[in-house]
Amino acid sequence: MACVDEPPEKHCWVCFATEKEDRAAEWVSPCRCKGCTKWIHQSCLQRWLDEKQKGNSGGAVSCPQCGTEYRIVFPKMGPVVYFLQQVDRALSRASPFAAAGVVVGTVYWSAVTYGAVTVMQVVGHKKGLDVMERADPLFLLMGLPTIPVMLVLGKMIRWEDYVVRLWQRHSAKLQIFSGLVPGMGRALPRVPVEGSYGGDHLSVSRTLCGALIFPSIANLVGRLLFRRVTSNLQRTILGGIAFVVMKGVLKVYFKQQQYLIQANRHILNYPEPEGQADGATEDEDSSNE
């Protein structure tokens, strides 16, 4: 508002009502403003404060014109209300830490359960239970959660990429294998930019799922390929090694073929319309004559 001189009667700058229109209303001058923005209805200011505080009754609110912070007072509360208020504040402060503790505890006991199931799956159900019953409880509480952690860390070791880089570096020396692997030992027209042919970026969900499902896959491969092995532990270990080797060989071959595809990429000329192409050919012939 551009009003500078104080009007003869009070004027609310929220609802624009005057003192004559509502003589029973309570008026307040909460800031240093002068003129027509000096006065405001107590009820209008209360509603305006509710909108600005947005549920935070203890938040500070200032005048939008002069920037003076409003002095807000509350009636004195009794000891019971004060105690309940302190309890409510303490619970509000402690709830994030409690929630974090619940999440950490859930993850920890999930890891313990997964570790116990993995032990029974790898060693055998009866033998696994017997081993865990005879083991120290503290050792189980510390050792079982490390099983999924070690599986995830092992999954993050990308040894196939190292083999692919060695293959690409020494491919010229491996021409004797050109009959087994297409493109082995051939000269490449260009070297692709690293990362443009991988197509296998490190995915958190893929790494986590692959690591946690690995014991089940190792057990299944061991049962299929090494049925004559009587020990469940040895059969699972052999199945895991066989799966890692077969998967690694296929992955290395796939990445190398992607590398060759990118290296032999070729860009074609823009196809001209037939009429323009014939005209261009005639122009070239006439210029040659």
Swiss-Prot record:
Catalysed conversion reaction: S-ubiquitinyl-[E2 ubiquitin-conjugating enzyme]-L-cysteine + [acceptor protein]-L-lysine = [E2 ubiquitin-conjugating enzyme]-L-cysteine + N(6)-ubiquitinyl-[acceptor protein]-L-lysine
Zinc finger (RING-CH-type): 4-73
Binding site residues for Zn(2+) 2: 31, 33, 63, 66
Binding site for Zn(2+) 1: 12, 15, 41, 44
CDD domains found in the cross-reference section: RING_CH-C4HC3_MARCH5
Alphabetized Pfam families for the sequence: RINGv
Pathway stated in the Swiss-Prot or TrEMBL entry: Protein modification; protein ubiquitination
MF terms in GO: ubiquitin protein ligase activity; zinc ion binding
Key words of the record: Endoplasmic reticulum, Membrane, Metal-binding, Mitochondrion, Mitochondrion outer membrane, Transferase, Transmembrane, Transmembrane helix, Ubl conjugation pathway, Zinc, Zinc-finger
Topological relation to the membrane, as annotated: Multi-pass membrane protein
EC number: 2.3.2.27
SUPFAM superfamilies per the UniProt record, alphabetical: RING/U-box
GO biological process annotation, one example: protein autoubiquitination
A Gene Ontology cellular-component term: endoplasmic reticulum
Domain of life from the UniProt record: Eukaryota
SS bonds (residue pairs): none
TM region positions: 97-117, 137-157, 202-222, 236-256
Principal cellular location given in the protein's record: mitochondrion
Subcellular location: Mitochondrion outer membrane; Endoplasmic reticulum membrane
Comment on protein domains: The RING-CH-type zinc finger domain is required for E3 ligase activity.
Function summary: Mitochondrial E3 ubiquitin-protein ligase that plays a crucial role in the control of mitochondrial morphology by acting as a positive regulator of mitochondrial fission. May play a role in the prevention of cell senescence acting as a regulator of mitochondrial quality control.
Protein name per Swiss-Prot or TrEMBL: E3 ubiquitin-protein ligase MARCHF5
Species per Swiss-Prot/TrEMBL record: Danio rerio (Zebrafish)
Classification of source organism: Eukaryota, Metazoa, Chordata, Craniata, Vertebrata
